[in-house]
Amino acid sequence: MSGFIDEVPIQIRAGHGGAGSVHFHKEKFVEFGGPDGGDGGKGGDVIFLAEGRMMTLENYLPDRMYAAQDGEPGLGQNRNGKNGEDLILKVPVGTQIIDSVTMELIYDFNHDGESFTIATGGRGGKGNTFFKTSVQQAPRYSQPGEEGGAFSLILELKLLADIGIVGLPNAGKSTLLAKITHAHPKIAGYAFTTLSPNLGVVHRHEDLFRYTVADIPGIIEGASRGVGLGISFLKHIERVQGILFLFDGGNLQLEEELEMLRSELGNYNQTLLDKKFLLVINKMDIWDNDPSFTEEIQKKYSHLGEIICISADKEFNLEYLLERIDKVFFTEKVKLVYENT
C-alpha cells in the first residue's frame, strides 16, 4: 500500500451563485423594451462520496483549496445562467470529516457509495425582470449571487476492519494476513517491514460470510511515546470486533509481550482493552509443530486467554484458527448465515 496517507487537512468551498442580469428587451421599432434580465445560476455543491476501492487519502494535497464551480451570470431575454457543476470528492470508506476549527466530527463514512453534501452552492441572484413592478417599470438593478459554503477540514481515515492483527515487529503478521486473505503485503525477515496497515478479506462458509482483517505495523515498548513507528496506526483497529495478538514462537516471552502490547494499546485508547481477543503463537514449525510442546504452552499460559498455535508460513493449523475466529467473534453472524440458507 504505497503512498498510504490517513490524515490530511484541506479547504473546501462551494460555488458562488451567479449574478442576476440587468438587461432590457431590444426589438426593432420598440423604443422602450421592458426588463428581461435572467437570474444567475446556482453555485455547485461540494459532495463527499465513499469509494470502497480506495484505501488511502493520498490523492489529497495538504491545505489545498477544493472548490466547486461558480454559477454563471444571468443573460438577457430572461435566460438564466448555468448552474455550477458540483465537486465530487471521493474518499475511502472509514473516512471521517472533522471541522479543523472546532475539531468536531462532521461526518463518518461507513458504507461504499455513501455520500454527504458538506457545502451547498450559493443561490443565483435575481435578474432585473424579478424587480419589475407597476411602479418600477424599468429597474436598473439586479441581485448579486450568494456565496457558497466554505470549511477548513481534516480528513481522517480509520480503516473499517473486523479483526486487527497486533504484535511485535517480525511476529509474522503480514504472512498470516496473506495466507488467510490472499492479500499481498510486503513480507521480509526483518522488523518494520510493514510501514502502513494492510487490509484483506477472509471468505468463509462457501463465501456466504466474509470479514476484513487489518495487519497493523509492529508495536514496540514505548510506541505510545513515539518510539519505533509510534501507535498512530492503531486508529485503524478502533472499530474492530476482535484482536489477534500474534507472537513469535521462536522467541516466546508471551506474558511479558502481551502485557507490553496491552499497555501500549491502553495508552492509545482504553476501549481497545475491552475488545475480545485470541492469543496466536506463530512459527511453530520451528518446533516441528510438536503437539506436546503446544500442549505445554497452552497449559502454562492458559490464565492469559485462549491460545492457538500455528505456522502461517507452513499453513499449519490455520483452518482451526479461522474456526475459532468464527466462534469467538462472529457466532451470531455465522448462525444467521446457516439459518438463511
UniProtKB/Swiss-Prot annotation:
Keywords: Cytoplasm, GTP-binding, Hydrolase, Magnesium, Metal-binding, Nucleotide-binding. Pfam families: GTP1_OBG, MMR_HSR1. Residues 2-160 form the Obg domain. Its EC number is 3.6.5.-. GO terms for biological process: ribosome biogenesis. Mg(2+) binds at S174, T194. Residues 161-330 form the OBG-type G domain. Its cofactor is Mg(2+). One of its GO terms (molecular function) is GTP binding. It is an enzyme of class 3 (hydrolase). GTP binds at residues 167-174, 192-196, 215-218, 282-285, 311-313. One of its GO terms (cellular component) is cytoplasm. It is found in: Cytoplasm. Gene3D superfamilies: GTP1/OBG domain, P-loop containing nucleotide triphosphate hydrolases. It comes from the Bacteria. Monomer. An essential GTPase which binds GTP, GDP and possibly (p)ppGpp with moderate affinity, with high nucleotide exchange rates and a fairly low GTP hydrolysis rate. Plays a role in control of the cell cycle, stress response, ribosome biogenesis and in those bacteria that undergo differentiation, in morphogenesis control. NCBIfam families: Obg_CgtA, PRK12299.1. PANTHER family: DEVELOPMENTALLY REGULATED GTP-BINDING PROTEIN-RELATED, MITOCHONDRIAL RIBOSOME-ASSOCIATED GTPASE 2. This is GTPase Obg. It comes from Leptospira biflexa serovar Patoc (strain Patoc 1 / ATCC 23582 / Paris). The lineage of its organism: Bacteria, Pseudomonadati, Spirochaetota, Spirochaetia, Leptospirales.
